[in-house]
Amino acid sequence: PIVVFHVDQPSNDFNSLFEVLSSDPDRYALDDTNVFPCAIGRSFYEQVLPPDSVHLGWCSYAAVWLSRVPSLIPGHFFPPSSTGVARAAFERQGDEDWEAFLSLRASEMRPGARLVVVLPGISESGLSGFAELMDHANAALAEMVDEGAITAQERARMVLGSYPRRKSELLAPFTKAGQFQRLSVEDCQIFVLPDTAWADYQLDGDKVALAMKQALFFRAVFMPSLASALTRMRAGDGDALTSFADRLQAGMVSRLATQPTSTDSFVEIIVLAKSW
């Protein structure tokens, strides 16, 4: 039998997950009665499975999120756009969290097990494919402050708790002894993931459609984190996220449509093995 554990925060919509697993035509289980999907609602900055129990681990994009936001970012919200003291704080937190993540997963893995981690990255020079998209969002947020749609205090609290790493940062724990917590690197690659919306734009030339696709991507992935800084959200106002997201999306579409740009991103894949 194969037991598959899906791990996410307790607030995750596990009902939707199991609906997909039961009805999606591309579901991995299909009709195999020997595959048993399960779910665990817990942060991966804790132990999530018993020691020496995992044969194969897979983490897609989640490891980019930090255990906590270590600093505000003056003038921006995107960690790769930070400088000085703020940048140093994110680098320290990124290093600490990566080692904590590896240590916890190592304890859960059986000897001979493999762990595959896929996550967004940046180049060694600090270049992120999302920089222009983030700058457009940052400018739209500044407009919202000027309009009174959000307060300056709310804007200052807006920080993405993510930290895209350089390849060298992923490999740093393994450089001294060749292993870390009995984990060794079998493969580590960084490559460019093309912007599919840009590919569509090259064919149809529709600037507004391009801008809408890019803004909707930003809305789905990043806006909930930014909206958590809103006083109304903290007070439990269920409409606050929608009204904030609608206004920010409109501002981004307006800017992106006048300055079409590709948001090709860097993706890293690291494959780790636990020694016997």
What are these regions (language model features)?
Residues F14-Q47:
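S-adenosyl-L-methionine
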Residues Q9-N12, V64, I122-E124, I190, ...:
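Conserved beta-strand elements of beta-rich interaction domains across eukaryotes
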Residues V3-D8:
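Conserved SAM-binding motif I beta-strand of class I
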Residues C59-A100, E108, L119-M158:
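Mobile active-site "lid"/loop adjacent to the S-adenosyl-L-methionine
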